[in-house]
């Protein structure tokens, strides 16, 4: 039986690398995969999933108006799909997560979703909220804070490198804009208005 998987983490935990490896594993066995990524995130070019270690794959784009079940069913009828993989799945809508569950339940195709659990305010993304609620399997991909603890929070930095937790939920950016930290240092960085000061304090402890 196919299942719906949600692989979640903070930033820079290797989600895209894990997705590309999973897709390759299917393809190596002669199976066909379909990869999706969010249209909104074009840091590495539109229409592809790229990892920080240099791997990449062509990808279909989804936005808030995409009818994923209809798209996947139509393509599956033309040529069998053995696995659907979705990068940046935090940007899915509630309806799209439901449609992906229908891909699993009605078409018997496994769906593997990779994305962030929470935003820079520590609040769930809509896509992540419903994947946490409806997935068959939840898998945490771990990364670490500068202190060595598990990083479960994401700090957003302004142009001067200061952390802040106000503004729009979605602002696309990489390491210059976001950094993954543990909960303790997330709170401390916001309290003192400086990630650098917290890092310096930790080095001297």
Curated annotation (Swiss-Prot):
Activity control note: Allosteric enzyme which is feedback inhibited by dTTP and activated by a number of dNDP and dNTP.
Main location: cytoplasm
EC numbers, comma separated: 2.7.1.21
Family matches, as InterPro entries: P-loop_NTPase, Thymidine_kinase, Thymidine_kinase_CS
Enzyme class: transferase
Domain of life per record: Bacteria
Binding sites annotated in the UniProt record for ATP: 9-16, 87-90
Cell compartments where the protein resides: Cytoplasm
This protein's UniProt keywords: Allosteric enzyme, ATP-binding, Cytoplasm, DNA synthesis, Kinase, Metal-binding, Nucleotide-binding, Transferase, Zinc
BP-aspect Gene Ontology terms: DNA biosynthetic process; dTMP salvage; thymidine metabolic process
PROSITE patterns: TK_CELLULAR_TYPE (PS00603)
Pfam families in alphabetical order: TK
GO terms, molecular function: ATP binding; identical protein binding; thymidine kinase activity; zinc ion binding
Cellular component annotations (GO), alphabetically ordered: cytosol
Active-site annotation: 88 (proton acceptor)
Binding site for Zn(2+): 145, 147, 182, 185
Catalytic activity: thymidine + ATP = dTMP + ADP + H(+)
Similarity remark: Belongs to the thymidine kinase family.
PANTHER family linked: THYMIDINE KINASE, THYMIDINE KINASE, CYTOSOLIC
HAMAP family, A to Z: Thymidine_kinase
Subunit structure: Homotetramer.
UniProt function note: Phosphorylates both thymidine and deoxyuridine.
Protein name as catalogued: Thymidine kinase
Species the sequence originates in: Escherichia coli (strain K12)
Gene designation per UniProt: tdk
């Amino acid at each position: 039986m196919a299942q719906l998987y949600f692989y979640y983490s903070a930033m820079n935990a290797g989600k895209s690398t894990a997705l590309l490896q999973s897709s390759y594993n299917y393809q190596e066995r002669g199976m066909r995969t379909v990869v999706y990524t969010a249209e909104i995130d074009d840091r590495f070019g539109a229409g592809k999933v790229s990892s920080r270690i240099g791997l990449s794959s062509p990808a279909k784009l989804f936005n808030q108006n995409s009818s994923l079940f209809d798209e996947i069913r139509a393509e599956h009828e033309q040529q069998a799909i053995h696995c659907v993989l979705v990068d940046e799945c935090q940007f899915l809508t509630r309806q799209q997560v439901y449609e992906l569950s229908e891909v699993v339940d009605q078409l018997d195709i496994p769906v593997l979703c990779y994305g962030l659990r929470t935003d820079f305010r520590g609040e769930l993304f809509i896509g992540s909220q419903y994947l946490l609620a409806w997935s068959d399997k939840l898998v945490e991909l771990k990364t670490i804070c500068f202190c060595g603890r598990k990083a479960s929070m994401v700090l957003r930095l302004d142009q001067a490198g200061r952390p802040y937790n106000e503004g729009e939920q979605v602002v696309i950016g990489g390491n210059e804009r976001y950094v993954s930290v543990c909960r303790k240092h997330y709170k401390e960085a916001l309290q003192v208005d400086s990630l650098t000061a917290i890092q310096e304090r930790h080095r001297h402890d």
